[in-house]
Each structure stands twice: as structure tokens, then as C-alpha cells.
């Protein structure tokens, strides 16, 4: 509640949310291939809880923007699409271009398919040579980050024109 009030006081347009339980994003020893995944029973509980949190946030005048993220239970394009398809319309989408490309997904496709739910973006670029090395060697997310996989838009391999047109 304290964080929510701070965001409201700052006139934030939304609150970004990502499920990071058991995330491997900061672990220097666990490769991304060992990230957590949800079984069907846990998925149903997860969706129920996301919907409940989102409804509470809407009641407070602050939409929830779900952030897919490397090393978490919602990482890939398919997982992100499934999350949006499974949740109420109150759950909005944040697309992070860098994380989506890192997960071998398509930000343009997500934006087109879920434009009515898209509320926020993080424009990160990716250095392809570092991404390729990280994927080939099953690096940890932390190592890929420290190696410089992410960069500012225009300094990497993402073509932002199609994404921004959506």
C-alpha cells in the first residue's frame, strides 16, 4: 500500500508488476535454462491472484502493467500471450523490447495482438553478438547483463520502426 500511495502521489500512469518468486535473474550460478516454470495447478492460482491484485489496483485508480522478464515465470512471447489471454481486461501489458528479444520473442507481434491491453513499454536494445554468445553458452542472466547484452535504443539490433508504428 505504501508503494501504491507513492506512485499515486507521483502521478504515475501505472504500476509495473512482475512475478519474481524463484527468479534466477540475479543468481550468478543458475543459467536461464533453469528458470522457474509454473505447472497447471500453480498457473491457475497465479492467474487468480494477478486478477485479484489488478482489480484492487483499479479500485485504487492505478492500473497494473505486467512486465515479462528474463529469468522469471513469464519470460517468453507464448507465456506473455497466455498471461494476457488468461487474465481479466484490468491486467495491462508492459512490453520490454530487450527482454522479449532476449527470450527469442517478437515485440511487434505482441503489440499488434494485445494493443488494447498495452499500457507501458520499456525500450531496451540488444547487442546481438552478446545475446548470441549468452544463448549459445547458456549463461546466467546476470552474466549476460554484466557482459553488456542490453543497451540503449539505436545501439543494438532491434528495429524500432515497426514496433513504434503499432
Where are these regions (language model features)?
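The substrate-binding groove and active-site-proximal loops of carbohydrate-active enzymes
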Residues: 1, 40-43, 148-155
